[in-house]
Amino acid sequence: MTPVIHTRDLTRRYGSLAAVNGVSISLDENRIYGLLGRNGAGKTTLMSLLTGQEFATSGDIEVFGTSPVENAAVLQRVCFIKESQRYPDDFKIKHVLRSAPWFFPNWDPDFAAALVTDFNLPLNRKMKKLSRGQFSAVGVIVGLASRAPLTFFDEPYLGLDAVARQLFYDRLLADYADHPRTVVLSTHLIDEVADLLEHVLLIDAGRIIVDAPTDELRGSVVNVVGGRDAVDRFTAGREVLHSDGIGGLVSATVSRLTDAERTAARDAGLELTAVSLQQLVVRLTESTNNEFQESA
């Protein structure tokens, strides 16, 4: 089966800065992916490359088996919703929704109307007069109602309050069940979307440092908690992603413990606690950044 997205050694440079650096990924159809990373890690640049809005410095990109650059047959199957979306100054919400079918063949006007009601949007208000939350809600509606086979959300929902964000997650999951497609969510709100994500791509300094199913990733790292001496003995010779403590109590984040090692830790009086996806992302990017600084 041909992947929806396939890249090989994809690189985008701005002068001496490699915003995307040697990225090789494959994304399958009908899955929800999380594209995670810190500010400036390369998330938006990568999505801009995949949607034909940026030109690669080197490497290859295939979307639906061919290049997305100036390719109408590909781009009409793609929806890219981003926080910095721009509209004509005189556009109202109703104009955005009326023009959407020109770009998205699978547009569902009834679903869009239901979402307008859900988010309580004023259809006759100009886009430039909207609050940040209302502006974000318009992007969410377009992304969902487009039903594009490949849909990118580049943090357009940051302006939404907690209730509205949960509404977005609920509507996304429900509609995805009825109308499967490939969805890529780029967000800093990792714990909020963790249960939606089937696969995680973690990018740092332009490089993909994690490309793994979410369930596999969650089980790959654990916190080992206990007395300092016991934790130090257990973690000796192991990769420790992070360690902190208060007084004599220490917590060390370690990766890839076998069942036998987990049993040995408990027999040594140590407690094993789960690491959330957000904590894992923080620990992995901290570790990668430290390695980069040491090699610089």
Describe each PLM feature range.
Residues 151-155, 160:
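Catalytic Walker B motif of ABC-type/P-loop ATPase nucleotide-binding domains
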Residues 168-257:
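ABC transporter nucleotide-binding domain
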Residues 51:
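Helix-to-loop junction immediately C-terminal to a conserved catalytic motif
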Residues 37-42:
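Walker A (P-loop) phosphate-binding loop of ABC-type ATPase nucleotide-binding domains
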Residues 82-138:
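ABC-family P-loop ATPase nucleotide-binding domains
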